[in-house]
Protein backbone atom coordinates (compact mmCIF):
# COMPACT_ATOMS: atom_id res chain seq x y z
CA UNK A 1 0.00 0.00 0.00
CA UNK A 2 1.19 3.48 -0.84
CA UNK A 3 0.81 6.12 1.87
CA UNK A 4 0.44 9.59 0.37
CA UNK A 5 0.28 12.66 2.60
CA UNK A 6 -1.04 16.05 1.55
CA UNK A 7 -0.37 15.71 -2.19
CA UNK A 8 -0.10 18.89 -4.22
CA UNK A 9 -2.80 19.36 -6.85
CA UNK A 10 -0.16 19.09 -9.54
CA UNK A 11 0.30 15.45 -8.44
CA UNK A 12 -3.36 14.48 -8.59
CA UNK A 13 -3.40 13.25 -12.20
CA UNK A 14 -0.50 10.91 -11.52
CA UNK A 15 -1.95 9.68 -8.21
CA UNK A 16 -5.38 8.97 -9.72
CA UNK A 17 -4.06 7.32 -12.88
CA UNK A 18 -5.52 3.88 -13.57
CA UNK A 19 -3.41 1.03 -14.99
CA UNK A 20 -3.24 1.17 -18.78
CA UNK A 21 -3.10 -2.03 -20.79
CA UNK A 22 -1.25 -2.34 -24.08
CA UNK A 23 -4.18 -3.09 -26.37
CA UNK A 24 -2.82 -2.98 -29.92
CA UNK A 25 -1.83 -6.66 -30.10
CA UNK A 26 -4.78 -7.61 -27.89
CA UNK A 27 -7.28 -6.15 -30.36
CA UNK A 28 -5.65 -8.04 -33.23
CA UNK A 29 -6.00 -11.32 -31.33
CA UNK A 30 -9.60 -10.58 -30.36
CA UNK A 31 -10.57 -9.52 -33.88
CA UNK A 32 -9.23 -12.81 -35.27
CA UNK A 33 -11.29 -14.87 -32.82
CA UNK A 34 -14.42 -12.84 -33.61
CA UNK A 35 -13.96 -13.34 -37.35
CA UNK A 36 -13.43 -17.09 -36.94
CA UNK A 37 -16.57 -17.48 -34.80
CA UNK A 38 -18.56 -15.39 -37.24
CA UNK A 39 -17.52 -17.69 -40.09
CA UNK A 40 -17.50 -21.05 -38.30
CA UNK A 41 -20.28 -20.84 -35.72
CA UNK A 42 -20.71 -23.54 -33.07
CA UNK A 43 -17.75 -25.61 -34.28
CA UNK A 44 -15.31 -22.76 -33.75
CA UNK A 45 -16.82 -21.81 -30.38
CA UNK A 46 -16.31 -25.40 -29.18
CA UNK A 47 -12.74 -25.38 -30.52
CA UNK A 48 -11.97 -22.31 -28.44
CA UNK A 49 -13.66 -23.84 -25.39
CA UNK A 50 -11.25 -26.76 -25.68
CA UNK A 51 -8.28 -24.37 -25.94
CA UNK A 52 -9.17 -21.78 -23.29
CA UNK A 53 -11.42 -23.65 -20.83
CA UNK A 54 -10.06 -27.17 -21.43
CA UNK A 55 -13.63 -28.36 -21.98
CA UNK A 56 -14.39 -30.90 -24.71
CA UNK A 57 -17.98 -30.15 -25.71
CA UNK A 58 -20.34 -31.82 -28.17
CA UNK A 59 -23.00 -29.13 -27.77
CA UNK A 60 -23.17 -25.63 -26.31
CA UNK A 61 -26.68 -25.48 -24.85
CA UNK A 62 -27.28 -26.22 -21.19
CA UNK A 63 -30.14 -28.73 -20.95
CA UNK A 64 -33.13 -28.57 -18.61
CA UNK A 65 -31.85 -31.79 -17.01
CA UNK A 66 -28.56 -30.07 -16.17
CA UNK A 67 -30.43 -27.14 -14.61
CA UNK A 68 -32.60 -29.47 -12.52
CA UNK A 69 -29.54 -31.39 -11.35
CA UNK A 70 -27.74 -28.16 -10.48
CA UNK A 71 -30.63 -27.03 -8.31
CA UNK A 72 -30.16 -30.11 -6.12
CA UNK A 73 -26.49 -29.24 -5.60
CA UNK A 74 -27.02 -25.68 -4.34
CA UNK A 75 -27.01 -25.55 -0.50
CA UNK A 76 -30.25 -24.50 1.18
CA UNK A 77 -28.66 -21.47 2.86
CA UNK A 78 -27.33 -20.22 -0.49
CA UNK A 79 -30.74 -20.68 -2.10
CA UNK A 80 -32.32 -18.65 0.71
CA UNK A 81 -29.73 -15.89 0.27
CA UNK A 82 -30.32 -15.79 -3.49
CA UNK A 83 -34.09 -15.59 -2.96
CA UNK A 84 -33.63 -12.63 -0.58
CA UNK A 85 -31.34 -10.84 -3.02
CA UNK A 86 -33.79 -11.50 -5.87
CA UNK A 87 -36.65 -9.92 -3.92
CA UNK A 88 -34.68 -6.77 -3.15
CA UNK A 89 -33.32 -6.41 -6.69
CA UNK A 90 -36.85 -6.84 -8.07
CA UNK A 91 -38.25 -4.27 -5.65
CA UNK A 92 -35.65 -1.62 -6.49
CA UNK A 93 -35.72 -2.13 -10.25
CA UNK A 94 -39.52 -2.41 -10.48
CA UNK A 95 -39.71 1.08 -9.00
CA UNK A 96 -37.77 2.36 -12.03
CA UNK A 97 -40.57 1.65 -14.51
CA UNK A 98 -41.02 4.53 -16.94
CA UNK A 99 -44.39 6.23 -16.96
CA UNK A 100 -44.52 8.43 -20.02
CA UNK A 101 -47.06 11.21 -20.14
CA UNK A 102 -48.45 13.16 -23.06
CA UNK A 103 -47.31 16.78 -23.27
CA UNK A 104 -49.06 19.50 -25.28
CA UNK A 105 -46.16 21.69 -26.38
CA UNK A 106 -48.66 23.98 -28.14
CA UNK A 107 -52.35 23.79 -28.89
CA UNK A 108 -52.73 20.98 -31.42
CA UNK A 109 -49.20 19.62 -30.86
CA UNK A 110 -48.94 16.57 -28.57
CA UNK A 111 -45.69 14.71 -27.85
CA UNK A 112 -44.95 11.65 -25.73
CA UNK A 113 -42.59 8.75 -25.19
CA UNK A 114 -43.25 5.03 -24.91
CA UNK A 115 -40.85 2.61 -23.19
CA UNK A 116 -40.27 -0.58 -25.18
CA UNK A 117 -38.08 -3.49 -24.06
CA UNK A 118 -35.07 -4.54 -26.11
CA UNK A 119 -36.36 -7.82 -27.54
CA UNK A 120 -33.16 -9.90 -27.36
CA UNK A 121 -30.38 -9.35 -24.82
CA UNK A 122 -27.22 -11.31 -24.11
CA UNK A 123 -25.71 -11.68 -20.65
CA UNK A 124 -22.07 -12.65 -20.19
CA UNK A 125 -21.12 -14.19 -16.84
CA UNK A 126 -17.36 -14.76 -16.44
CA UNK A 127 -15.74 -17.91 -15.12
CA UNK A 128 -12.36 -17.28 -13.56
CA UNK A 129 -11.67 -17.61 -9.85
CA UNK A 130 -15.22 -17.14 -8.52
CA UNK A 131 -18.73 -18.08 -9.73
CA UNK A 132 -20.52 -14.75 -10.23
CA UNK A 133 -24.10 -15.93 -9.71
CA UNK A 134 -24.85 -12.51 -8.22
CA UNK A 135 -24.19 -10.93 -11.62
CA UNK A 136 -26.79 -13.27 -13.13
CA UNK A 137 -29.36 -11.72 -10.80
CA UNK A 138 -28.18 -8.16 -11.45
CA UNK A 139 -28.59 -8.53 -15.22
CA UNK A 140 -31.40 -11.02 -15.72
CA UNK A 141 -33.86 -9.56 -13.19
CA UNK A 142 -34.09 -6.06 -14.72
CA UNK A 143 -34.18 -7.63 -18.20
CA UNK A 144 -37.18 -9.70 -17.14
CA UNK A 145 -38.91 -6.73 -15.49
CA UNK A 146 -38.31 -4.63 -18.62
CA UNK A 147 -40.07 -7.28 -20.71
CA UNK A 148 -37.19 -8.55 -22.86
CA UNK A 149 -38.58 -11.47 -24.87
CA UNK A 150 -35.33 -13.44 -25.09
CA UNK A 151 -32.63 -13.40 -22.41
CA UNK A 152 -29.56 -15.36 -23.52
CA UNK A 153 -26.77 -16.19 -21.07
CA UNK A 154 -23.26 -17.35 -21.92
CA UNK A 155 -20.79 -18.55 -19.30
CA UNK A 156 -17.67 -20.73 -19.55
CA UNK A 157 -17.88 -24.33 -18.34
CA UNK A 158 -15.30 -26.08 -16.19
CA UNK A 159 -12.95 -28.66 -17.68
CA UNK A 160 -15.67 -31.30 -17.22
CA UNK A 161 -18.08 -29.30 -19.34
CA UNK A 162 -20.21 -28.26 -16.36
CA UNK A 163 -21.50 -24.82 -15.41
CA UNK A 164 -21.39 -23.90 -11.72
CA UNK A 165 -24.68 -24.98 -10.09
CA UNK A 166 -25.31 -21.60 -8.43
CA UNK A 167 -25.09 -19.84 -11.80
CA UNK A 168 -27.67 -22.21 -13.29
CA UNK A 169 -29.94 -21.90 -10.24
CA UNK A 170 -29.80 -18.09 -10.32
CA UNK A 171 -30.39 -18.05 -14.08
CA UNK A 172 -33.51 -20.21 -13.83
CA UNK A 173 -34.82 -18.20 -10.89
CA UNK A 174 -34.27 -14.87 -12.66
CA UNK A 175 -35.98 -15.91 -15.89
CA UNK A 176 -33.12 -16.52 -18.33
CA UNK A 177 -34.44 -18.02 -21.59
CA UNK A 178 -31.40 -19.93 -22.83
CA UNK A 179 -28.02 -20.79 -21.29
CA UNK A 180 -24.89 -21.70 -23.24
CA UNK A 181 -21.47 -23.07 -22.33
CA UNK A 182 -19.28 -20.43 -23.92
CA UNK A 183 -16.79 -18.01 -22.44
CA UNK A 184 -14.42 -15.25 -23.42
CA UNK A 185 -14.25 -13.60 -26.80
CA UNK A 186 -15.98 -16.52 -28.49
CA UNK A 187 -19.10 -16.00 -26.34
CA UNK A 188 -19.27 -12.29 -27.14
CA UNK A 189 -18.83 -13.00 -30.86
CA UNK A 190 -21.51 -15.71 -30.79
CA UNK A 191 -24.06 -13.40 -29.17
CA UNK A 192 -23.16 -10.53 -31.49
CA UNK A 193 -23.51 -12.49 -34.74
CA UNK A 194 -25.36 -15.68 -33.85
CA UNK A 195 -24.38 -19.31 -34.42
CA UNK A 196 -26.35 -22.46 -35.13
CA UNK A 197 -27.18 -22.67 -31.40
CA UNK A 198 -26.63 -19.24 -29.89
CA UNK A 199 -29.10 -16.53 -31.01
CA UNK A 200 -27.93 -13.14 -32.18
CA UNK A 201 -28.90 -10.49 -29.63
CA UNK A 202 -29.34 -6.72 -29.86
CA UNK A 203 -27.41 -5.73 -26.72
CA UNK A 204 -24.71 -7.47 -24.65
CA UNK A 205 -24.23 -7.00 -20.91
CA UNK A 206 -21.72 -8.25 -18.39
CA UNK A 207 -18.18 -7.97 -17.03
CA UNK A 208 -15.05 -9.76 -18.14
CA UNK A 209 -11.30 -9.58 -18.53
CA UNK A 210 -9.48 -7.34 -20.98
CA UNK A 211 -10.19 -9.76 -23.85
CA UNK A 212 -13.93 -9.76 -23.20
CA UNK A 213 -13.89 -5.98 -22.84
CA UNK A 214 -12.05 -5.61 -26.13
CA UNK A 215 -14.49 -7.99 -27.84
CA UNK A 216 -17.47 -5.99 -26.60
CA UNK A 217 -15.89 -2.79 -27.86
CA UNK A 218 -15.18 -4.25 -31.29
CA UNK A 219 -18.63 -5.75 -31.88
CA UNK A 220 -20.28 -2.54 -30.66
CA UNK A 221 -18.70 -0.48 -33.42
CA UNK A 222 -21.46 -1.47 -35.83
CA UNK A 223 -23.23 -4.72 -35.02
CA UNK A 224 -24.63 -4.75 -31.47
CA UNK A 225 -25.00 -2.44 -28.46
CA UNK A 226 -23.19 -3.00 -25.16
CA UNK A 227 -23.90 -1.93 -21.61
CA UNK A 228 -20.82 0.25 -21.01
CA UNK A 229 -17.02 0.30 -21.28
CA UNK A 230 -15.47 -1.74 -18.49
CA UNK A 231 -12.21 -2.00 -16.62
CA UNK A 232 -10.92 -3.47 -13.36
CA UNK A 233 -13.28 -3.09 -10.40
CA UNK A 234 -12.52 -0.29 -7.92
CA UNK A 235 -13.53 1.24 -4.59
CA UNK A 236 -12.78 4.48 -2.81
CA UNK A 237 -13.45 4.95 0.89
CA UNK A 238 -13.92 8.61 1.85
CA UNK A 239 -13.50 8.90 5.62
CA UNK A 240 -12.85 11.28 8.49
CA UNK A 241 -11.72 10.74 12.07
CA UNK A 242 -15.09 9.21 13.02
CA UNK A 243 -14.60 6.19 10.74
CA UNK A 244 -13.97 2.73 12.17
CA UNK A 245 -10.57 1.52 10.86
CA UNK A 246 -11.73 -2.10 11.09
CA UNK A 247 -14.62 -1.33 8.72
CA UNK A 248 -12.45 0.72 6.36
CA UNK A 249 -9.82 -2.02 6.10
CA UNK A 250 -12.51 -4.64 5.50
CA UNK A 251 -13.98 -2.53 2.69
CA UNK A 252 -10.60 -2.06 1.01
CA UNK A 253 -9.89 -5.79 1.23
CA UNK A 254 -13.31 -6.74 -0.13
CA UNK A 255 -12.35 -4.89 -3.28
CA UNK A 256 -8.76 -6.12 -3.39
CA UNK A 257 -9.81 -9.79 -3.40
CA UNK A 258 -11.75 -9.32 -6.66
CA UNK A 259 -8.59 -9.53 -8.74
CA UNK A 260 -4.94 -8.54 -8.94
CA UNK A 261 -5.84 -5.50 -11.03
CA UNK A 262 -8.61 -4.25 -8.69
CA UNK A 263 -8.21 -0.72 -7.37
CA UNK A 264 -8.66 0.16 -3.67
CA UNK A 265 -8.18 3.69 -2.35
CA UNK A 266 -8.71 5.56 0.93
CA UNK A 267 -9.08 9.34 0.99
CA UNK A 268 -9.12 10.69 4.53
CA UNK A 269 -8.71 13.85 6.56
CA UNK A 270 -7.35 11.87 9.54
CA UNK A 271 -3.69 10.87 9.80
CA UNK A 272 -4.57 8.63 12.75
CA UNK A 273 -7.09 6.72 10.63
CA UNK A 274 -4.58 6.35 7.81
CA UNK A 275 -2.11 4.70 10.20
CA UNK A 276 -4.72 2.48 11.84
CA UNK A 277 -6.04 1.25 8.50
CA UNK A 278 -2.56 0.04 7.49
CA UNK A 279 -2.41 -2.11 10.64
CA UNK A 280 -5.95 -3.40 10.17
CA UNK A 281 -5.39 -4.38 6.55
CA UNK A 282 -2.34 -6.43 7.52
CA UNK A 283 -4.26 -8.09 10.36
CA UNK A 284 -7.32 -8.98 8.29
CA UNK A 285 -5.29 -10.23 5.33
CA UNK A 286 -4.38 -13.30 7.33
CA UNK A 287 -8.00 -14.47 7.37
CA UNK A 288 -8.58 -14.34 3.61
CA UNK A 289 -8.69 -17.45 1.43
CA UNK A 290 -7.80 -15.22 -1.54
CA UNK A 291 -4.90 -13.57 0.28
CA UNK A 292 -2.46 -13.87 -2.63
CA UNK A 293 -4.84 -12.02 -4.96
CA UNK A 294 -5.60 -9.33 -2.37
CA UNK A 295 -1.90 -8.75 -1.61
CA UNK A 296 -1.08 -8.20 -5.28
CA UNK A 297 -3.97 -5.76 -5.62
CA UNK A 298 -2.99 -3.88 -2.46
CA UNK A 299 0.53 -3.36 -3.78
CA UNK A 300 -0.87 -0.58 -5.98
CA UNK A 301 -3.54 0.68 -3.56
CA UNK A 302 -3.31 4.19 -2.14
CA UNK A 303 -4.11 5.66 1.27
CA UNK A 304 -4.29 9.41 0.70
CA UNK A 305 -4.28 12.01 3.49
CA UNK A 306 -5.73 15.41 2.56
CA UNK A 307 -6.04 18.66 4.50
CA UNK A 308 -9.85 18.94 4.68
CA UNK A 309 -13.14 17.53 3.42
CA UNK A 310 -13.39 20.10 0.63
CA UNK A 311 -10.16 18.80 -0.88
CA UNK A 312 -11.27 15.21 -0.28
CA UNK A 313 -14.44 15.86 -2.28
CA UNK A 314 -12.55 17.49 -5.15
CA UNK A 315 -10.17 14.54 -5.31
CA UNK A 316 -13.06 12.07 -5.20
CA UNK A 317 -15.02 13.75 -7.98
CA UNK A 318 -11.84 13.87 -10.07
CA UNK A 319 -11.34 10.12 -9.57
CA UNK A 320 -15.01 9.18 -10.25
CA UNK A 321 -14.90 5.80 -8.49
CA UNK A 322 -17.04 2.83 -9.44
CA UNK A 323 -17.89 2.28 -5.75
CA UNK A 324 -17.69 5.08 -3.18
CA UNK A 325 -18.09 4.40 0.54
CA UNK A 326 -18.58 7.51 2.69
CA UNK A 327 -17.73 6.96 6.35
CA UNK A 328 -17.94 10.44 7.87
CA UNK A 329 -19.96 11.87 10.72
CA UNK A 330 -22.00 14.02 8.32
CA UNK A 331 -22.15 11.53 5.46
CA UNK A 332 -25.44 12.80 3.99
CA UNK A 333 -24.05 16.31 3.64
CA UNK A 334 -20.86 14.94 2.07
CA UNK A 335 -22.87 12.72 -0.29
CA UNK A 336 -24.79 15.74 -1.53
CA UNK A 337 -21.57 17.08 -3.03
CA UNK A 338 -20.68 13.91 -4.95
CA UNK A 339 -21.21 14.31 -8.69
CA UNK A 340 -19.02 11.52 -10.11
CA UNK A 341 -19.49 7.97 -8.80
CA UNK A 342 -21.09 4.72 -9.91
CA UNK A 343 -22.72 3.66 -6.63
CA UNK A 344 -22.44 5.34 -3.21
CA UNK A 345 -22.61 3.62 0.18
CA UNK A 346 -23.52 5.87 3.09
CA UNK A 347 -22.49 5.46 6.69
CA UNK A 348 -20.58 2.91 8.72
CA UNK A 349 -23.05 0.08 8.10
CA UNK A 350 -23.31 0.33 4.31
CA UNK A 351 -20.44 -1.77 2.92
CA UNK A 352 -19.90 -2.25 -0.80
CA UNK A 353 -20.71 -5.93 -0.27
CA UNK A 354 -24.35 -4.99 0.37
CA UNK A 355 -24.70 -3.47 -3.09
CA UNK A 356 -22.69 -6.29 -4.62
CA UNK A 357 -25.24 -8.82 -3.45
CA UNK A 358 -28.49 -7.99 -1.77
CA UNK A 359 -29.44 -4.38 -0.97
CA UNK A 360 -31.28 -4.15 -4.30
CA UNK A 361 -29.10 -1.73 -6.24
CA UNK A 362 -27.25 -2.94 -9.32
CA UNK A 363 -23.58 -3.86 -9.11
CA UNK A 364 -22.87 -3.51 -12.83
CA UNK A 365 -21.25 -0.08 -12.75
CA UNK A 366 -18.95 2.22 -14.75
CA UNK A 367 -15.25 1.81 -13.95
CA UNK A 368 -12.05 3.50 -15.10
CA UNK A 369 -13.43 7.02 -14.57
CA UNK A 370 -16.44 6.42 -16.83
CA UNK A 371 -18.72 7.38 -13.93
CA UNK A 372 -18.20 10.95 -15.16
CA UNK A 373 -20.35 10.14 -18.18
CA UNK A 374 -22.04 6.75 -17.69
CA UNK A 375 -24.63 5.35 -15.29
CA UNK A 376 -24.69 1.85 -13.88
CA UNK A 377 -27.06 -0.78 -15.25
CA UNK A 378 -30.70 -0.09 -14.44
CA UNK A 379 -34.10 -0.87 -15.91
CA UNK A 380 -33.43 1.84 -18.51
CA UNK A 381 -30.50 -0.23 -19.81
CA UNK A 382 -32.96 -2.83 -21.13
CA UNK A 383 -35.47 -0.51 -22.77
CA UNK A 384 -35.69 2.00 -25.58
CA UNK A 385 -37.88 5.06 -25.53
CA UNK A 386 -39.78 5.70 -28.75
CA UNK A 387 -40.94 9.27 -29.30
CA UNK A 388 -44.40 10.01 -30.72
CA UNK A 389 -45.96 13.24 -31.90
CA UNK A 390 -49.43 14.05 -33.15
CA UNK A 391 -49.97 17.38 -34.90
CA UNK A 392 -53.49 18.54 -35.68
CA UNK A 393 -54.30 21.22 -38.28
CA UNK A 394 -54.41 23.83 -35.51
CA UNK A 395 -50.96 22.72 -34.38
CA UNK A 396 -49.53 22.85 -37.89
CA UNK A 397 -50.92 26.37 -38.29
CA UNK A 398 -49.16 27.36 -35.07
CA UNK A 399 -45.69 25.90 -35.71
CA UNK A 400 -45.63 25.60 -39.51
CA UNK A 401 -44.40 29.14 -40.31
CA UNK A 402 -41.49 28.77 -37.88
CA UNK A 403 -40.54 25.43 -39.46
CA UNK A 404 -40.59 27.01 -42.93
CA UNK A 405 -38.24 29.79 -41.82
CA UNK A 406 -35.82 27.40 -40.12
CA UNK A 407 -35.76 24.96 -43.06
CA UNK A 408 -35.19 27.77 -45.56
CA UNK A 409 -32.24 29.06 -43.54
CA UNK A 410 -30.70 25.59 -43.50
CA UNK A 411 -31.22 25.44 -47.31
CA UNK A 412 -33.41 22.33 -47.00
CA UNK A 413 -36.13 23.14 -49.51
CA UNK A 414 -37.90 19.77 -49.31
CA UNK A 415 -38.18 20.11 -45.54
CA UNK A 416 -39.83 23.48 -46.01
CA UNK A 417 -42.12 22.18 -48.73
CA UNK A 418 -43.39 19.30 -46.56
CA UNK A 419 -44.86 21.98 -44.29
CA UNK A 420 -45.87 24.45 -46.99
CA UNK A 421 -48.13 21.97 -48.83
CA UNK A 422 -49.92 21.20 -45.58
CA UNK A 423 -50.40 24.86 -44.67
CA UNK A 424 -51.85 25.48 -48.12
CA UNK A 425 -54.30 22.60 -47.61
CA UNK A 426 -55.35 24.00 -44.23
CA UNK A 427 -55.97 27.47 -45.70
CA UNK A 428 -58.29 26.23 -48.46
From Swiss-Prot:
Role description: Catalyzes the sequential NAD-dependent oxidations of L-histidinol to L-histidinaldehyde and then to L-histidine.
NCBIfam families (alphabetical): hisD
PANTHER family: HISTIDINE BIOSYNTHESIS TRIFUNCTIONAL PROTEIN (PTHR21256:SF2), HISTIDINOL DEHYDROGENASE HDH (PTHR21256)
Catalytic residues, chain numbering: 322-323
Catalytic activity line of the entry: L-histidinol + 2 NAD(+) + H2O = L-histidine + 2 NADH + 3 H(+)
Stated name of the protein: Histidinol dehydrogenase
EC number annotated for this UniProt entry: 1.1.1.23
Listed HAMAP family: HisD
Gene3D superfamilies, alphabetized: 1.20.5.1300, Nitrogenase molybdenum iron protein domain (3.40.50.1980)
One GO CC term, this protein: cytosol
CDD domains listed in its UniProt record: Histidinol_dh (cd06572)
Pathway(s) this gene product operates in, as recorded in its UniProt entry: Amino-acid biosynthesis; L-histidine biosynthesis; L-histidine from 5-phospho-alpha-D-ribose 1-diphosphate: step 9/9
Lineage, top ranks: Bacteria, Pseudomonadati, Bacteroidota, Bacteroidia, Bacteroidales
Entries under Pfam families matching the protein: Histidinol_dh
Swiss-Prot/TrEMBL keywords: Amino-acid biosynthesis, Histidine biosynthesis, Metal-binding, NAD, Oxidoreductase, Zinc
Binding site for substrate: 233, 255, 258, 323, 356, 410, 415
